[in-house]
Amino acid sequence: METTTPPRPGLREMKKRRTHDELLRAAVHLFTSQGYERTTVDEIAEAVDVSQRTFFRYFAGKEEAALALEGITVGRFVEGVRARPAHEAPMEALRQAVLEGWNSLSEAIESIASVELYMRMYRVIESTPVLLAAHLRRSAETEEAIARVLAEREGLDMDADPRPRLAVAVFGAVMRVTERQWITGEDYSLEEMRELTSRHLDQVGPALLGGWRAGT
């Protein structure tokens, strides 16, 4: 079977991508160093030596720029779930999509910001009410999109069968706990993230069905 190599982007597309990434990098640096509310669009544009008008060609506003790194991770994860082998059970597909997707995701993120800067941006989102509200809205939309992917994989009517939404809700809760533990720890390595993810997913069954007291 022949494989085709995707065409390389043209110079125009490469320049647009470079400008987008430079604006995003500048925005993240400013948000994490002086705060989201204190940072203006003009400051972000000036840091890259472009006009405010150019900024708005790439982002609808500060909020979109602040959540852009998160958007990259979410988009990659949804596509990762969609690409999992059909024989995998739903929870296993979710598990493998996140565990196997971290390498390529890390490369995409680190081309813009270091893992440490990414973690700092995550803290800014959690501590800024307007960003946290937007983050929660996006999280709900993402869970719905992933549940729909699972329903399609399993041939289910998502409106009649609650299992896709239940599975994604449980998985999402595990990932939120994992991310919070990761960003508050001292080890920002991918191996630590994988280890935490695997450990917490392994604990879902016992946590839901077993007793928690010592000796039970």
Which residues are covered by each model-predicted region?
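Hydrophobic alpha-helical bundle segments that form small-molecule/ligand-binding pockets
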Residues: 128, 140-167
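Basic, helix-initiating cap at the start of DNA-binding domains
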Residues: 1-34, 38-50, 67
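Short amphipathic alpha-helical segment with a characteristic S/N-K-E followed by hydrophobic residues
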Residues: 23, 61-66, 76-77
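C-terminal peripheral helix-coil segments that are non-catalytic and often amphipathic
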Residues: 1-4, 148, 152, 180-216
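Hydrophobic/aromatic residues within well-ordered alpha-helical segments
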Residues: 19, 73, 98, 138-142, ...
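Hydrophobic alpha-helical connector segments
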Residues: 68, 75-121
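Short hydrophobic/aromatic patch on the recognition helix
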Residues: 51-59
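Hydrophobic/aromatic-rich alpha-helical bundle segments in the mid-to-C-terminal region
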Residues: 136, 156-201
